[in-house]
Amino acid sequence: MSNFSITVIGAGAYGTALAVSFSKKNRKVFLWGRNKKHMQSLKKDRCNKKFLPKINFPNDLKIEISLKKAIKYSNTIVIAVPSIGFKNILIKIQPFLNKNVFLICGTKGLEPRTGRLLQEVVYDILGRETCLSIISGPSFARYLAIGLPTSMVLANNCIKTCKFLANKLKNKFLNIYSISDLVGVQIGGVIKNVIAIASGMSDGIQMGPNAKTAIITYGLEEMYKLGKVMGANEYTFMGMSGVGDLVLTCTDDESRNRKFGILLAQGYSIENAKSKVGCIIEGYNNIKEILILSCKHKINMPIIKQVYKILYMHQPVKKSILNIFLNKK
């Protein structure tokens, strides 16, 4: 396909970073966001001052104010919006989608209230004939946008299509592996955010590196157990979208979910912690839905349960973190 073109839907930190990275190789990359004032600022400044300050846009990255034009321009649509707004975005873009479009989901989360995987939301709204891929992996926005080496995973049921898209999206700083396990990639991207909250809490009450490493390891086990019963390939969790994303999100200072956990452990209220982080915290948004899945599939997930008790039952942080270890004995 010589006329390859990409539109990224979502002009937050992650969507902007993906668009910047993709435009280092592709000449037709468009970025659209729902806030018109924000998009006009991006167009004027050639930089996302709010979410990724001091990172200038490549010349080949076009800022598009019109959703209709942004969708019609492209044969590849990448959705990078918070999970809470994912369904509404699909409904909005549906009338404008080109036939045989490649749809790539960069959102890490579950459908609110139901706990459904986002692939099921896509198939419900756009049909099961949709050529859907999932992109995930350890890829914090700032590092990706400035061109630091990054490895990600792209999943598609058709491995030939997956390899084609991965080749189009990757560049000398971004490597993208191709796999066919959509379920495993999604589960990894969801669970790691809650584990990162627990990791941050452990750091916030100074439990030490031994405890944090144990939480990460236990978290990988919970990810594996839920993924396996939902039909994922166990080897997916040993890769970039599993242990790779988990380790980064649990240990790096750029992690919103980890910051949120640290602040809660330091005594901040949930609302004040959310405000101080200043961005969407997917682990907080999705924990109820993860519990729905664990109950449905009869999977014991001690970390998920204990973080839930902190967030919704006002259980003290230290008690919950210690309970994680007690439940593992």
UniProtKB/Swiss-Prot annotation:
InterPro entries per UniProt: 6-PGluconate_DH-like_C_sf, 6PGD_dom2, G3P_DH_NAD-dep, G3P_DH_NAD-dep_C, G3P_DH_NAD-dep_N, NAD(P)-bd_dom_sf
One Gene Ontology CC term in the entry: cytosol
Pfam families the UniProt entry points to: NAD_Gly3P_dh_C (PF07479), NAD_Gly3P_dh_N (PF01210)
Residues that, per the record, bind NADPH: 14, 34, 108, 141, 256, 280, 282
Binding-site residues for sn-glycerol 3-phosphate, renumbered to this chain: 108, 137, 139, 192, 245, 255-257
Pathway: Membrane lipid metabolism; glycerophospholipid metabolism
Active-site residue list: 192 (proton acceptor)
Annotated localization: Cytoplasm
EC numbers, comma separated: 1.1.1.94
GO BP term (any one): glycerophospholipid biosynthetic process
Predominant place of localization: cytoplasm
Catalytic activity: sn-glycerol 3-phosphate + NAD(+) = dihydroxyacetone phosphate + NADH + H(+); sn-glycerol 3-phosphate + NADP(+) = dihydroxyacetone phosphate + NADPH + H(+)
Keywords carried by this UniProt record: Cytoplasm, Lipid biosynthesis, Lipid metabolism, NAD, NADP, Nucleotide-binding, Oxidoreductase, Phospholipid biosynthesis, Phospholipid metabolism
A molecular-function term among this protein's GO annotations: NAD binding
PANTHER family the record matches: GLYCEROL-3-PHOSPHATE DEHYDROGENASE (PTHR11728), GLYCEROL-3-PHOSPHATE DEHYDROGENASE [NAD(+)] 2, CHLOROPLASTIC (PTHR11728:SF1)
Family stated for the protein in its record: Belongs to the NAD-dependent glycerol-3-phosphate dehydrogenase family.
HAMAP family: NAD_Glyc3P_dehydrog
Role played: Catalyzes the reduction of the glycolytic intermediate dihydroxyacetone phosphate (DHAP) to sn-glycerol 3-phosphate (G3P), the key precursor for phospholipid synthesis.
Protein name: Glycerol-3-phosphate dehydrogenase [NAD(P)+]
